[in-house]
Curated annotation (Swiss-Prot):
GO terms for molecular function: metal ion binding; phosphatase activity. Keywords: Carbohydrate metabolism, Cytoplasm, Hydrolase, Metal-binding, Zinc. It catalyses: D-glycero-alpha-D-manno-heptose 1,7-bisphosphate + H2O = D-glycero-alpha-D-manno-heptose 1-phosphate + phosphate. The lineage of its organism: Bacteria, Pseudomonadati, Pseudomonadota, Gammaproteobacteria, Enterobacterales. This is D-glycero-alpha-D-manno-heptose-1,7-bisphosphate 7-phosphatase. PANTHER family: D-GLYCERO-BETA-D-MANNO-HEPTOSE-1,7-BISPHOSPHATE 7-PHOSPHATASE (PTHR42891:SF1). Pathway: Nucleotide-sugar biosynthesis; GDP-D-glycero-alpha-D-manno-heptose biosynthesis; GDP-D-glycero-alpha-D-manno-heptose from D-glycero-alpha-D-manno-heptose 7-phosphate: step 2/3. GO terms for biological process: carbohydrate metabolic process. GO terms for cellular component: cytoplasm. InterPro entries: HAD-like_sf, HAD-SF_hydro_IIIA, HAD_sf, Heptose_bisP_phosphatase, Histidinol-phos. The keyword NAD does not apply.
């Protein structure tokens, strides 16, 4: 058990780490967002551990399998490591209320905007939530962070266009500009 609490940058995947591709599950379709790598390195240099939290409704909808999701996840995690960015952990929610895979077609507490994935991370790691940040490209990401008690939540413009960001979200161009805001 860790005694020192860590500060974490909780990051959504699609639209934050990689360019938005609906139901991304193929390595050949994966492309990093603008200034992603340099931003991730800077965030790590500032003492944040990186945890990715991602809704993956495509699994429940039958668009791709858990195995396909995991192959892509293993690939980009290794690719980031080769580029000098260590990811502490990755949590995903495979559920969707209107899916076609019966055991995954349900309301759940892990799917954002619920804070379930953040709470899973807090059970696994000793996290200083008040020193942590969250970065997403949708208001549902921001709501998950707020519900988990994360004081600084950033909405990036690299993913889904958001016409009305939530009141407490800090709007930013990309991960690199966020790294400059938190130094």
């Amino acid at each position: 058990m860790q005694h020192n609490k860590i500060k974490v940058a909780f990051l959504d995947r699609d639209g934050v780490i990689n360019k938005e591709v609906n139901y991304l599950h193929k390595i050949e379709d994966f492309e990093y967002t603008s200034k992603c790598i340099v931003g991730l390195k800077k965030i790590r240099d500032l003492g944040y551990e990186i945890i990715i939290i991602t809704n993956q409704a495509g699994i429940a909808r039958g668009y791709y399998s858990e195995k396909q999701y995991q192959l892509l996840t293993d690939w980009y995690r290794n690719d980031l490591k080769e580029k000098g960015v260590d990811i502490l952990d990755i949590f995903h929610c495979p559920h969707y209320p209107d899916g076609i895979v019966p055991e995954l077609s349900k309301d759940c507490y892990c799917r954002k905007p619920s804070p379930g994935m953040i709470e899973q991370a807090r059970k696994k790691y000793s996290i200083d939530i008040k020193s942590s940040i969250l970065v997403g490209d949708k208001n549902s990401d921001i709501h998950a962070g707020e519900r988990a008690g994360i004081p600084r939540c950033f909405l990036v413009k690299t993913g889904h266009p958001t016409s009305e960001p939530t009141e407490n979200a800090i709007l930013s161009n990309n991960l690199f500009t966020i790294s400059k805001l938190i130094e």
